Regions:
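Short amphipathic alpha-helix starts
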Residues: 10, 42-43, 47
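Short, solvent-exposed alpha-helical "recognition" segments
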Residues: 27-34
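Short, flexible helix/strand-to-coil boundary loops that buttress conserved ligand/catalytic motifs
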Residues: 25, 37, 51-55
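A short, Lys/Arg-enriched interface patch at domain edges and termini
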Residues: 45-68
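Short Lys/Arg-enriched helix C-cap and helix-to-coil transition segments
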Residues: 34-40
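Intrinsically disordered and other compositionally biased segments
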Residues: 23-24, 39, 63, 67-68
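Polyanion-binding surface elements
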Residues: 1-23, 53
Length: 68
């Protein structure tokens, strides 16, 4: 089992701000996460899967995973 990532580590891996990762989590649009007591943790595989789901081949392709 790979070590779990903190929110800061997940943000660093994704090259996003911690605040953006937090907003994505709260809105339900971010990677799957674990809530352990008061801590939020991410499995590396879930972060990578979330990122892979956002691959598009052109700018005209609609990203159906990112509704606002």
């Amino acid at each position: 089992m790979q070590p779990l990532l903190t929110q800061d580590e997940a943000a660093e891996l994704l090259k996003l701000s911690v605040r953006t990762v937090e907003r994505l989590r709260v809105s339900g649009r971010g990677p799957k996460f674990l809530k352990i007591l008061r801590s939020v943790r991410y499995r590396p595989a879930d972060v990578e899967a979330w990122l892979a789901a956002r691959i598009v081949s052109s700018t005209s392709e609609e990203n159906t995973n990112d509704h606002r």
